[in-house]
């Protein structure tokens, strides 16, 4: 793996590129993302996520740059106002974490990995049970005398 050394000034520049990417997401400016070849899947998925959470905002909690890679830990906050993964809007305010790894080459994001806590979101929406917790009401059998939830 090519591990070229960057100066602190260059680290700031690579972090700023990721910062501008996150700002463009918050502003729903998906066209600005198209200049980064590593963001193709993000450009495809984000309109779906932003339709479910139109007021979604990103707060960078921690960011580290090493070589040409920037690692970002961020918090996402938004109101569930549109369908998401088949779940109708709940108008519930949600917060979840996301970890990003971005590789920057010549000022462009060429590789982007995002790991969002979607299981946590689904638990908060009552779609899946928390580990060790009870099944959400919507998954429990309506007839309490039955065998419980069924799986298709």
Question: Language-model segments: which ranges?
Answer:
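C-terminal and inter-domain tail/linker signature
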Residues: 1-152
């Amino acid at each position: 793996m090519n591990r070229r050394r960057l100066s602190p000034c260059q680290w700031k520049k690579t972090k700023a590129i990721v910062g501008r990417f996150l700002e463009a997401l918050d502003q729903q400016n998906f066209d600005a993302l198209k200049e980064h070849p590593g963001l193709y899947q993000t450009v495809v998925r984000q309109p779906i996520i932003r339709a479910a959470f139109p007021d979604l905002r990103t707060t960078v909690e921690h960011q580290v740059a090493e070589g040409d890679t920037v690692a970002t830990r961020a918090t996402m906050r938004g109101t569930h106002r549109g369908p998401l993964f088949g779940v109708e809007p709940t108008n519930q305010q949600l917060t979840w974490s996301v970890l990003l790894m971005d590789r920057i080459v010549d000022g462009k994001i060429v590789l982007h990995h995002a790991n969002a806590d979607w299981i946590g979101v689904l638990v908060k929406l009552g779609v899946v049970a928390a580990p060790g917790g009870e099944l959400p009401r919507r998954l429990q059998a309506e007839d309490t005398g039955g065998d419980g939830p069924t799986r298709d």
